[in-house]
Amino acid sequence: ACINEYTVDAHGEKHFTEYDEFYFEPFDAKTIINRLKEIENSLNQQYDFKLHSDYGANLLKLGCTPEALQVFTALIQKYPNQYSIAANLGTAYELSGKNDSALKYIKRGVELNPSSHFNSEWVHIKILEAKLNKYTPEQLANADILKLGSVPPKKIEQKLRQVYYQLHERMPFTPLGDALLAKVIYETAQHTSESFSLERGILFYNIAAIYNPSLKDDAAKKIARNKQLQKRYKVKEKNTHHKIFDIAILQKHRPLKGNYNYKVYKVG
């Protein structure tokens, strides 16, 4: 079942929202290992390159990045035009710290399937480009990573929802203390508050401060502003977004660092 509500932005305008469209769900090692074993059973009976790709994707989730990279570098040789393989190889390279190669294959994935992930891969590209810029802390603080300010007002909600999707995908892989992701989340909070939802903006400011505690004071000021605006517009939102997003889980978050005796399959 879906629950739909209205929310208010910094100008007092109301917007329609599905409250569960952004949430944080860390990977569960037991579930992933069970899935890996299921895939192994299937691959042992009959090879399927799509299952092989799924095998690599689950290794990535488990934190077995070198093993996953081996899977995707082998697959891309025979299946260079498969979107999932190119995109997963890009992610494997990024998690390996090879951002040049990551950007190459994420862009290749977009060429193969421009509408993938609800047309949100532009966010992934922006983040990789920012990584390659190698900002100093001062430069990062003044950078505009997502360039959301240039988005026409009629399209900003759509763009924000694409950002929410990418954050949902990225956060389970990303440890707390990642300053770049914190900056992206902070920008998301600013534009969400301004153009979509004061309540959800508060949530994103809190998340940004968890990822980078140096943002805590600025985030607190922004949260206070949002709450003042809620009072001005006589908004009595129910903190629905905060209920679906468990801050306590995020505060304990650590990406998985798996140790799995994976099997090598010949690409067929």
Model-inferred region functions:
Residues F27, I127-D144, R225-G258:
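Alpha-helical linker/edge segments of TPR/alpha-solenoid repeat scaffolds
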